[in-house]
Amino acid sequence: MAKILLLPPALINQIAAGEVIERPASVVKEIVENAIDAGATRLALEIEAAGSKLIRLSDNGSGIEKEDLALAFTTHATSKIRTLEDLEQVSSLGFRGEALASIASISKTTLTSCTQSSDHAWKISPHLNENITPAAHPQGTTIEIRDLFYNTPARKKFLRSDRTERYHITQLLAGIALSRAPFVITLHEQDRKILEYGGKTLKESLKSVMGDEFLAQSIEIQAEHEGMHLHGWVGLPTYTHQQTDKQYFFVNQRLVSDKLVAHAIKQAYEDMIHRQRHPIFVLFLTLDPALVDVNAHPSKREVRFRQAQLTHDFMFSSLHRALRNIQPRAAQLTPLSSASPKLPESTTATAQPHHKMIPHTFARPPRLQETKAYYQWAQTPPPAVTPAPQPEIKKINLPLGQALGQIHGTFIVAENAQGLVVVDMHAAHERILYEQFKSVLKTQKQIPVQRLLLPLPLTLTPVQQDSLAQHGAWLKTLGFDWTINDKEFILLTVPARLKNSDCISIIGDVLQELSEFPKSTQLQRAQEQIIANMCCHQAVRAHDLLSISEMNQLLRDLETTPAAGQCNHGRPTWIQLDATQLDALFLRGQ
């Protein structure tokens, strides 16, 4: 058996680097956090080959004293904490004192720093084993990391393409810029400016990273509970993304990724967005540092909350309440060109007209008396016309107004006090039915049923049979009942609201979907998804013609429905075109 030996310091640092330094973005994270902890508000980052050849960061922070420079590259040397109590209430981004030592062990690192009280700067290059030397540098620090992983080639093989590594760096800088203000960070690669994030205020930083569209398609939230404060912006349920790269969550200004928080946010958006879409948000949670453990992971990206359930419930309830009170925004219209509208091009000679044309030639020339009579009639002034009395226009105070008609049997057009409302009648009806189903289940625990005059037979697949055996009792709470004769499933009752729907297709889909939710803890989610699909089956369809009274009833129901701004899949249910937008469409007032 091999003897147990102490590892050399260089190898210890390289092992530590394996936990902390995964890629160039990991290096950037550590040195940027050190700069922020030093009070820097302006950072300039330069890279080459997406950071594998060069990472250089200059800041305007407080700098490092000469006598501390060498110690800064020593393992577990830090100015951030002194005791266990400090660790349990740490508020700085860095605190372990191992980042610089780890970085220097796998790269060629040079650090130059100057404090306000120093006459000049001092420079140190650990890989050269040279003494600290004087240098020219304004107050602040510049750290230069060259040839990352030069002495650990196996690690270098795991790096991705320059494009991917650069993407990770830009994502990191976006998150850091969002976390504080005033703050500005720029990124250059080979003398080319890649980005500049930040601003004098948090909203300026938000705009620089997320853009104007996010500000227009999000709501700002503020909530407090038992010492926790939540602030930020969440995207509308109709404004989502295919990936999760537009999600930023900060705990005490530290960008983190937490499963507990992710679950709370996802649950808050449940039944408002499509399952394959992801919400966009920038959220800041502030709480006592003693209530969150930031020392749970080497990269400090994951945290542990000491009151996990309380934190989860606070996040969920705050977001859920805000999201369900959202009203759709005014429609975003593409500006019209000032040029005259283009008329349809004339048809070719072979084109067939839609209507029979009146001949332009006469069978005979008009007689003289006919021509004279026409001339006299044309010269006679028209009789005076008394205008018909106009009905008094009543002010429309209903939020969604009064229905005017349908477009293509798909959209309801209504007029309200602000202007024009356009409603997607299927999406709107779907949301109405969904909330009604949920309300009945919540209050009565049993959906009203309709017994079928003619029971409907259905041949079940093995998967559907298993679902029926496992969840049969629960299915009956949704309003379904059945009997089985000679292995044939015969449907006897359905939810009363589905009596006019394709019940065979619905029950088949329900049983199939239940196979995807085998755990009892997931039944709530399964129930909501199944109800959503049932409502989708029952809701009015495109090209269903409704009377004006039916349209108005749908509008009134929608006005009293929670989360009425979008259907269960995240599509808008209605949009508002105000008078200003309508004027702009016709170039009025220009």
UniProtKB/Swiss-Prot annotation:
**Region (Disordered) spans which residues?**
335-354
What the entry lists under InterPro entries is as follows: DNA_mismatch_repair_CS, DNA_mismatch_repair_MutL, DNA_mismatch_S5_2-like, HATPase_C_sf, MutL/Mlh/PMS, MutL/Mlh/Pms-like, MutL_C, MutL_C_dimsub
Q: Could you confirm whether the keyword DNA damage appears in this record?
A: yes
- Per UniProt, which keywords does this protein have? DNA damage, DNA repair
Among the Pfam families in the record, one is: HATPase_c_3
Q: Where is the composition biased (Polar residues)?
A: 335-351
Q: Return the GO cellular component terms, semicolon-separated.
A: mismatch repair complex
Q: Note the Gene3D superfamilies from the entry.
A: 3.30.230.10, Histidine kinase-like ATPase, C-terminal domain, MutL, C-terminal domain, dimerisation subdomain, MutL, C-terminal domain, regulatory subdomain
Q: Which SMART domains would you find in this protein's record?
A: DNA_mis_repair (SM01340), MutL_C (SM00853)
Q: Name one GO biological process term.
A: mismatch repair
| UniProt GO MF annotations | ATP binding; ATP hydrolysis activity; ATP-dependent DNA damage sensor activity; mismatched DNA binding
* Signal sequence segment: none
User: Which protein family is named in the record?
Assistant: Belongs to the DNA mismatch repair MutL/HexB family.
| Function of the protein | This protein is involved in the repair of mismatches in DNA. It is required for dam-dependent methyl-directed DNA mismatch repair. May act as a 'molecular matchmaker', a protein that promotes the formation of a stable complex between two or more DNA-binding proteins in an ATP-dependent manner without itself being part of a final effector complex.
What protein name applies here?
DNA mismatch repair protein MutL
Q: Which gene encodes it?
A: mutL
